[in-house]
Amino acid sequence: MNGISNALNGLYDISGVEVGQHFYWQIAGFQVHAQVLITSWVVIAILLGSAVIAVRNPQTIPTAGQNFFEYVLEFIRDVSKTQIGEEYGPWVPFIGTMFLFIFVSNWSGALLPWKIIQLPHGELAAPTNDINTTVALALLTSVAYFYAGLSKKGLGYFSKYIQPTPILLPINILEDFTKPLSLSFRLFGNILADELVVVVLVSLVPSVVPIPVMFLGLFISGIQALIFATLAAAYIGESMEGHH
């Protein structure tokens, strides 16, 4: 039980981890991480604006933009169906939101000039460059797969913790707490490392060398969004099937 308690404490305390300086707003006596909110709002505005443009005037013969958005939707459906199974339909919006938010957030770190915006403390960066964002996304995924299992199986969902033998109960419980930890640290670590490498190379050789690294970073950022969305869908499918 000590291991489970430590895991719970880790999930609670991890949001206090800080890398570098941060800019906070004081709202109702609470410190709100302003950097993450500002950049997250920009990403959400980009996604909402793109969605409005995509559905504003659909054509019978699709335009290039409409074809692109239909391809993205089909791609998300394929990922969801592959990992969840035939009952994937209700989960497409969730998986799609996760994938698109992470994808645009990751790319914003490389393509948007966040650094030119001056703050009293710290600097703006991709939302996924902050551990608070990645932990929040991972916890949302945890809530989603618990909900998926309970909505399909009711209280019988908890029988999975004593399968194939009750001896594995502590390990099976601990596994549910390590999933969000691994999701959050994988995404946070990769995006932070990518931005740090680019910053260091730009400071050392500001002309040519960082360009290939930036393209590699864009590729890795896309892969990280796909990995997160795929694992989220896999966890949801696993909870609905009731096996590991």
Curated annotation (Swiss-Prot):
Subunit structure, as described in the record: F-type ATPases have 2 components, CF(1) - the catalytic core - and CF(0) - the membrane proton channel. CF(1) has five subunits: alpha(3), beta(3), gamma(1), delta(1), epsilon(1). CF(0) has four main subunits: a, b, b' and c.
Its biological purpose: Key component of the proton channel; it plays a direct role in the translocation of protons across the membrane.
Gene3D superfamilies listed in its UniProt record: ATP synthase, F0 complex, subunit A
InterPro entries given in the database record: ATP_syn_F0_a_bact/chloroplast (IPR045082), ATP_synth_F0_asu (IPR000568), ATP_synth_F0_asu_AS (IPR023011), F0_ATP_A_sf (IPR035908)
Organism in which the protein naturally occurs: Gossypium barbadense (Sea Island cotton)
PROSITE patterns in the cross-refs: ATPASE_A
GO CC, alphabetical: chloroplast thylakoid membrane; plasma membrane; proton-transporting ATP synthase complex
Xref: NCBIfam families: ATP_synt_6_or_A
Example GO molecular function: proton-transporting ATP synthase activity, rotational mechanism
Transmembrane segments: 35-55, 92-112, 131-151, 196-216, 217-237
UniProt keyword terms in alphabetical order: ATP synthesis, CF(0), Chloroplast, Hydrogen ion transport, Ion transport, Membrane, Plastid, Thylakoid, Transmembrane, Transmembrane helix, Transport
Subcellular location: Plastid, Chloroplast thylakoid membrane
Family note: Belongs to the ATPase A chain family.
Entry protein name: ATP synthase subunit a, chloroplastic
Keyword Cell cycle: no
Keyword Chloroplast among UniProt keywords: yes
